[in-house]
Each structure stands twice: as C-alpha cells, then as structure tokens.
UniProtKB/Swiss-Prot annotation:
UniProt organism field: Phenylobacterium zucineum (strain HLK1)
Subunit architecture: Homohexamer. Organized in a ring with a central cavity.
Top class in the EC scheme: hydrolase
GO biological process, one term: protein quality control for misfolded or incompletely synthesized proteins
Domain of life of the organism encoding this protein: Bacteria
Protein name: Lon protease
GO molecular function list: ATP binding; ATP hydrolysis activity; ATP-dependent peptidase activity; sequence-specific DNA binding; serine-type endopeptidase activity
Upregulation: By heat shock.
Length: 792
C-alpha cells in the first residue's frame, strides 16, 4: 500500500511506514518523556499518528539548533514510541507524552507527506544470558542506587523502585542512560550500542564518572554543615530563650495579642476557631526572621478579615427595586419583571435557595449594570469576579499554602473585598473560561453554584469550610455554546437581545449624553445634541447590539466641544446631523440598502451573531462547466449542506420553474456569501440560497426591499430557525421593508419590538412556493421562453 486519500483529503500512511519526529534529546525504550512539538510539521506528524494509530519514531538531530532538520541531518537509529497523551501547554504549544518501546533503524525515507515518514526495521533486544552479563547487571544496579542516595535532593520514589525492580539488564541500562546527565551525542552512542555487554559497560563507565562528582559534592556539603554548626547552635539557644520568656509571660509580642483578640471576635465557627488557634500557637513558636512566620501571619490575617457572620439584611422594597431598575435601564421590560420576581422570592424566603441568574446577550446591552441594580435594590455590596481567560482551577479554589505566594481563590478574595457574606457577586464572562493543564475552573464552579454544596465551600488556601449559601450569585455570558452543560444546568438563563435604533436613541438621550457631559466637564446648557444627530450617529457611525460604541462616539463629539470651551468659547453649542462629518469624519457604516443590486442571483438573508443580528447577501452565478457547485465565503459544514439541499430542491422543481434540466449539466453554479473573511455557519440561510438560485436560473430578480431567513428541506418545507428577534431588528436597521419568516416561528413574533413590527411587513412561509410568490419580482411574458433565450 502506497498511501490513499482519507475522507478529509489527507494522505494516509503506508502500513509499513512510520512517522519520524526529530528531537533534541535521546528517548530510550521503556522510558516515558514529554516532548514539546515546536514545529508545524511535528504537530501534523503527531496528529496523524494519533489519528491512524501509528507509532512515532523519535530520532536525534545531529545539529540540535537546526530549525527544520531534514533526513540528512538525522541519525539513522531512533526509538519507536507510543503516544500516551496529547495536550496543549499553558504557553499554547502542543505537548505529547511518549513511551519508548524499542530501537528502530531507518532504511529509507518516504516522500509526499508534510512531515518525515520512513521505512525501517525494529531492533530486538539480544538475549541476556551468561554470568558476565549478570555480574555487569548487578554492578550497574548498585552504582545507580548509590548515585540516587548521594543526590542533594531526595529522588522520586518511583525512580528508586524502577531501578530496584528492573526486570532485565537491557531495561536497567536504558533507564540509567535516560536519567544520566550526558550530552545528546553520548546518549545516542549508548542507543546505537546493540550488544548488551558493551552497552552495560558504557553506561557503567559514564555512571562511575557521575558517582565521583556526587561523592565530592557530598563531602563538601558535609564540611559546610559542620562550619554552620555554631550558627545553628546560637539560633537554637535564642529560640529556647524565647520559649522560656513565653513560659514566664515575658516579652510576648503585641502582634500575637492582637491576632488572638481578632480570632475571638471574628465570629468564626468552632472548627475554624480551633484551626486559627493552632496556627497562632505555631506563629508564636516561629522566629520573626523565619520565612514561615510571614506565611502563617498572612494566613491568620485572611481568616480574621473574612466576614464570617451575616448582618441582619434590610427588607427588600419591590417598589424601590422597580424604581432603581427603571432609573438604571431603559426597556428590557421582561428582564426587569423576572428580576422583580427573583427579588420577591428573596423577600418571602430569605433562607430559601433561589435560582442563580445568568444574563446572556451581546456586549454593551447592560448585563453587568443589571447586577449592580440588583445589589442596590437588595441594599447589599456588589463585587465582580472576571472569569474571562481563566484556565486554572486554582483561580477559583485558591492555591495550597505549600506554594510560594499562595493566596485564596477569586471567590474568597471577592467576599473579603465585599466585607459581607451576603453580597451580590457577579461572575462576569463565565463563557470565556477554558480548561488547562492545571484543571478545569468550570468544574470548580459547580461546587460554588450548587446550593447543596456551597454551605461548606473549602478553599485550598483556607483549608476550612466557608458558607457561600447567602451569596447572591449572578453570571453573565455572551453565548451559551461554550458553557459546559453541568454548569449551565445550575443557572437560569435570561436572554438579553440587542437594542433597536429607537431604544438606542432613548438610552442616549436619558443616560449616555448626561454621563458623557459629566465626564467631559460640560453642562446641558452648554451643549445640546439634536435627536436627528443621535439617529444619524446610530445609523451611520455605529453597528452593534449594545450602546458602547454609541457612547464612545458621543464622547468624541463632546470632547471636540470641550476644546472650544477651554479655548474661551462661551456661546451654547448645538450639534445637528450636518455637524457629525466635520467632527467624526465620513460615516463608517455603509447603507445596506445601497449595497443591494437588483440583478438575478442575489438574495438578502438574515443571520444571528453573538453581537446581534446581521443581514447577509447570497450571491449566485453560473458559468459554462460540468455541473459542479462551488461554495465560497468561509462557509461552515452546515451552511454547505444547506446550499446542496437548495440546489437539489431547485433541480427537482426545474420543470415547474421553467428551467431547462440540461442547464445543470452544462453549467457550474457558484454561490458566494460576503464577507469572505468572516466564518459563517448554520441552516438559516437555506431559503435565501434557494431564492438566489431560482432568481439566477429564471432570470427573475429578488425584491430589493425583502430579506428572508429559514431552513429549507428537500420537500420544499420552510423549517424554523433561531434568533428571530435579532434578525428582524437587523433587517429594520438596514432599511428592509419586508421580511420572510418561517411560519413555525410565528410564536416568536411577540418578542419583536412593537416599533419594529410597525415598520416591517412580516410574511410567514410554509413552503418554498410561498417564498417564490412573495420574494421574486413578477416578470411579464413566459418565464420558460426567457430562460431559453438566456441559455442561448
């Protein structure tokens, strides 16, 4: 077998070939070693070997500094190894853990792969028989055990056990050679020594040199310890004197007295009090100059500064809560009502286990500020824990005190910052966490958010239980897809959609302009921004679901005005639509209506993104060919299948549409979805793709004031899709007047803002025929004749 093409287009490895990975150190049989894959070719080699379950051959480079070694710069003898694990390190570099199996000699190289592939033969171990080999085996074992005893630091118990339990002379020689501090060429020399007696002699000779160094090092260390004896004796006498003073009640440090009083007054549970007293006694026995003294003192300070008790909470006033929510946020009526329900349950059952709210929506729609409003309504402190980019479980649970610079996790740190155990804690960007080599932080959050477990949350640093049951947890996320299922199951998801243009104008008038006036040292009497200017700012200078970019643009306008007042201008300034371009420059958002072209083969679709809805143009054209379907625009697998389905549906309806069937065999059809640099996926473009193909093949244009969404089936049914509200709002913002939607999504109509429904005509589709009737411009004359003329 010379290699075949796999399903994904990659060439498979021949059965008698192996993948070769150059390494900078020698890997011996029977030994497990991690390897960093620092070249793209090495990554591709390891991935294909894993995928096809091929072993790797690890071969030493002759020049370890060579950036991309070829066959000529590699040794012929290497080690056949199995890949045990493939992980990505904290630095982003892939790592593999490999276990050597046996020696392997390369005979010839196989070309045609993006990495090194070779053929060769396995080198079996020779028979270990005879008294000479047995004597060398026992001598090498005694040398290795002596070397392990002479090491400055205690060796791992597994290594000692491996030396003592080596089953064969060959295995022992390879194990010792692997851990010897030798240069790579010396290790390669041992690897290439097949004769067992010669190999044992070489390893024993190298180990004997190392033993001499270790013996000399041990003697020097012994003399150093003797010279330090007097100093240690003085330190011991000082410690004894301090102990005598403590027994007599003399010289007690004021700091210890303060800590003892703080422990008694902190309101800690009895278990925690006992632990604190134990650490306090340990602190009293420790000299202040010792490094351990600072660690124990810091630990005790953390214990006494945490809010162990729960103050009596003020009753929740629902009318006040409504006022605060309306004062801080415009719109979001359903969200506010759900928050009021949440607060009502908290008022009636303060000790109850209320659900954990998770606000999901695009950036800038007010997720974090909603949490702050909840804290104001409950009269509790608000703390925010940012989880974006967290990939270490210790960020949640804390580090054990054995580590230098250890601290509690973010949860306990936030509790200390709040100063109250019943605070409102926002877990921000909970969807941005990721698992790393140090554990999965989302798994640690399962305990934090579970009411059955968080009554005794145990931080690794504190090592005592802390009750989190009175904390009001609120989470935020931009999308749900990246939140693990068990974690998502512990939260009640509340979706926040993007704002309409009218809502953005209201928010700007009520909140953003006032906030930016204060930030720039101006007053409403000095500057006025006309409503028409705000509308132009929203439509032509920002494109977002939230209002962050809008606030930045308002800030730019006001900073321009602030310069004028700082230079002595005194007259009030009024900013209208005509003033925007001189200050902000030309509009940065193109008019989507102007981008449309009323030519056959172009349809306007609608898409959902994590930052709101977008309109999507589907372009189709045909060229002479042999019936291929060409798809471009970074389309995902699902979207590609939608295009195939759309083409098959059009082929099946060719006669009814007046399309010559032979046209499909004589032409290539190309579907493109701008922008080409943006990845796209999902089934909701099925109707738009079908309409673009029908428009192309019948020479009838799709109405330029119409956008559409929906999944299509081979039977011509229009299936429901998600994100209806966001898509319809995006269509209205882009100037569309008619929107074609799946009839099975009619229940989502109530989520569409009233002002948007008043400006759009919503047409509900059961089948593709409904879309053809509503979406294509009527043409005079016989469509079949038009198509024949176009084909000719």
């Amino acid at each position: 077998m010379n290699g075949e093409q796999s399903a994904n287009g990659a060439r498979t490895l021949p059965d008698d070939a192996v993948v070769v990975v150059p390494v900078s150190n020698v890997i011996f049989p029977g030994v497990v070693f991690p390897i960093v894959l620092d070249r793209p070719s090495a990554v591709a080699a390891a991935q294909q070997a894993l995928r096809e379950q091929h072993p790797l051959v690890l071969v030493l480079q002759q020049d370890v500094q060579a950036p991309d070694p070829g066959p000529q710069s590699l040794h012929r003898m290497g080690t056949l190894a199995n890949v045990l694990r493939y992980v990505t390190g904290p630095d982003g570099a892939p790592h593999v853990a490999c276990q050597g199996v046996e020696r392997f000699e390369i005979d010839e190289w196989v070309e045609g792969f993006p990495f090194l592939v070779a053929r060769g033969r396995r080198i079996p171990e020779p028979e270990a028989e005879g008294a000479a080999i047995e004597a060398r085996f026992l001598h090498l074992r005694s040398q290795a055990l002596e070397a392990l005893q002479l090491l400055p630091q205690s060796p791992p118990g597994e290594l000692v056990a491996a030396v003592e339990g080596a089953s064969s002379p060959a295995a022992l020689a390879d194990l010792v050679a692997a851990y010897l501090d030798l240069q790579p060429p010396e290790k390669q020399q041992i690897l290439e020594t097949i004769d067992l007696e010669a190999r044992l002699d070489k390893v024993s000779a190298f180990l004997a040199q190392r033993l001499e160094v270790l013996r000399l090092t041990s003697e020097i260390a012994q003399r150093t310890r003797q010279s330090l004896g007097e100093r240690q004796r003085e330190t011991l006498l000082r410690e004894q004197m301090a102990a005598i003073q403590r027994e007599l009640g003399e010289g007690e440090r004021e700091e210890l007295v303060e800590l003892e009083a703080a422990i008694e007054n902190a309101g800690m549970p009895e278990e925690v009090v006992q632990q604190a007293r134990k650490e306090l006694r340990r602190l009293a026995r420790t000299p202040e100059a010792a490094a351990e003294y600072g660690m124990v003192r810091t630990y005790l300070e953390w214990l006494v500064e945490l809010p162990w008790g729960v103050p009596e909470a003020a009753p929740i006033d629902l009318a006040e809560a409504r006022r605060i929510l309306d004062e801080d946020h415009f719109g979001l009526e359903k969200i506010k009502q759900r928050i009021i329900e949440h607060l009502a349950v908290r008022r009636l059952a303060p000790e109850g286990k209320a659900p954990i709210l998770c606000f999901v929506g695009p950036p800038g729609v007010g997720k974090t500020s909603l949490g702050q409003s909840i804290a104001r309504a409950m009269h509790r402190p608000f703390v925010r824990v940012s989880l974006g980019g967290v990939h270490d479980e210790s960020e949640i649970r804390g580090h054990r005190r054995t580590y230098v610079g250890a601290l509690p996790g973010n949860i306990i740190q936030a509790i200390r910052k709040a100063g109250r155990r019943d605070c409102v804690m926002m877990l921000d960007e909970i969807d941005k966490m990721s698992a790393g080599i140090h554990g999965d932080p989302s798994a640690a959050l399962l305990e934090v958010l579970d009411p059955e477990q968080n009554v005794a949350f145990r931080d690794n640093y504190l090592a005592v239980p802390f009750d989190l049951s009175r904390v009001v947890f609120i989470a935020t996320a931009n999308m749900l897809d990246t939140i693990p299922g068990p974690l998502r199951d512990r939260m009640e998801v509340i979706q926040l959609s993007g704002y309409t243009a009218g809502e953005k104008r209201q928010i700007a008038e009520r909140y953003l302009v006032r906030r930016q006036l204060e930030a720039n040292g101006l007053t409403a009497e000095q500057v006025q921004i006309e409503p028409a200017a705000l509308e132009t700012l929203i439509a032509r200078y920002t494109r977002e679901a939230g209002v962050r970019s809008l606030e930045r643009e308002i800030g730019r306008l006001l900073r321009h005005v602030a310069v004028r007042f700082a230079e002595g201008h005194t007259e009030p300034v009024r900013i209208g639509p005509t003033n925007l371009e001189p200050i902000l420059g030309p509009p940065r958002v193109e008019n989507e209506v102007a981008m449309r072209t009323s030519v056959p083969g172009v349809a306007t679709g609608l898409a959902w993104t994590p930052v709101g809805g977008e309109i999507l143009f589907i372009e189709a054209t045909r060229t002479p060919g042999d019936g291929r379907l060409i798809l471009t625009g970074q389309l995902g697998e699902v979207m590609r299948e939608s295009a195939q389905t759309a083409l098959s549906l059009v082929k099946s309806r060719a006669e009814a549409l007046g399309v010559t069937p032979s046209l499909f065999k004589e032409s290539d059809i190309h579907i493109h979805v701008p922008a080409g640099a943006t990845p796209k996926d999902g089934p909701s473009a099925g109707v738009a793709m079908t309409m673009a193909l029908i428009s192309l093949l019948t020479d009838r244009t799709v109405r330029s004031d119409t956008a559409m969404t929906g999944e299509i089936s081979l039977r011509g049914l229009v299936l429901p899709v998600g994100g209806i509200k966001e898509k319809v709002v995006a269509a209205a913002t882009a100037g569309v007047r008619r929107v074609l939607l799946p009839a099975r999504n009619r229940a989502d109509e109530r989520d569409i803002p009233e002002e948007t429904r008043q400006t759009l005509e919503l047409i509900w589709l059961e089948r593709i025929e409904d879309a053809i009737e509503a979406g294509l411009d009527p043409r005079r004359g016989d469509v079949r004749q038009t198509q024949v003329r176009a084909a000719s």
